[in-house]
Each structure stands twice: as structure tokens, then as C-alpha cells.
Amino acid sequence: LKGFFHYMCTQVNKLTANPTENISLGTPQKALPKYLTENEAVELLKNIQSDFYERDYCIIVFFLNCGMRLAELITINLGDFKDDTIKITGKGNKERLVYLNTACQAALEHYLPARAALNNLRDKEALFVSKKTGRRLTARRVEQIVANCLKSAGLDNMGYSPHKLRHTAATLMYQGGVDMLAIKEILGHENVSTTQIYTHINQQQLKQAVEASPLADTGYIAPQSKAMTDSKQDLSLIHI
């Protein structure tokens, strides 16, 4: 609308003044990212059903614990692991180290033997490979795997995706007391301002927690009687 009135004033000279010139458009509020609650994340892990369980379980565990992007997960190679860390190649080919917690290490220990047992393994370096072709998983295939796992857990109608699992990892870390700068490094964000969105999520939860109090709707309770109020005033004078 502002552009239309600007055009009418400057190009066709139909107006002498732009009535929208001093109207501020404001800054649109960013939508809070969707994420699984801790209970939903546990249910997801407990209800994975797959003909290659070890691989799919490991994928979900990595998303939920490392907060990596889909593109980062599918490019992981066996040579990217060193001790209890994994080298992740992020946007702009920038590398970062992420530590593997106990859950990630356990998932990896169960998956690697199952991967090695494949008879048709072709991409020798790729961590996550197809059981059918032996080649590195594509982004689309991982999306399907995540969708199937969510469906098995009854979470398929909530708009979740691999990127939502990344949001889940960051949110649960923040709720667990992890420093924002540490989360920034784990996620591979350029600026901490990008990571700040997770503080808004927590503030919203704090508000909801207070409003959930059974006393939240009691409102203002007036004195039961004027006599009771007067007696309290008299007692207060005694102590002066």
C-alpha cells in the first residue's frame, strides 16, 4: 500500500502528499520454532519401528542430542570421529567439533556392527547408508525415516521434521541450563542472536507455568467484613 501511494505521488502526480508516509510498518515477530517436549522425545526413541533399527535409532539420537542439520548428518563420514567427538561440516564448509554424549556413543556402538554386516556396502566412508543399495543416504530418504519414526510414536500430525528435531535438541539443552554461547557453538550459528530464539521459548514456558497455578484464577479476594478489617486495624495500633 505504501508503494502504491508512493507511485501515485512521484510517477503519475495524482497526489501531492503520501498519506502513508508516516505510518510505521513495525517489525514482524518471528514465529517460535516447533520442538518436541522431553516426554515426546523419549516416546519417539522408544517407538522406532524399522527394518534397519540400529541405523534409524542412531539417526534420531544424533538429531536429538547433537542438534545437527539434515545436510550435516548425511555428509558424516567414519573418518569424522575421533575419541568422543565428531567433526561436522556446516554451512560454508565451516567445520566444528561436537562432543558425543553417552546416548550418542551407545547408539553408534550398536549401529556400526550392523552397518559393517551389510553385504552390499558401497560407500565405505559414509556413516549412514542405505540397507538396499549400500550407498550414502540422501536427504529425502532421511526425511522419510524421520517421518516414519514420528508416525510410529504417534507424533506425525504435529508438523515435526528433521529440522524440528534440531530445534528440540537446542531447546532441551537450554532448558537443562546449558549456556547460550555453548549452544551457539554446538548448532554452528554465526551469531548468538540466531540462538536467542530459544530464550523466548523458555520465557513463554515460564509464563505458562505461572498461569497453570491452581490459584491463578482466584482474582482479588475482598475482606470478609468491615468489622474484621476494623479489628485488624485496632490490633495494629496496639503494636505501635
Task: Identify the residue ranges that each predicted region occupies.
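Conserved catalytic core of the tyrosine transesterase superfamily
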Residues: 1-237
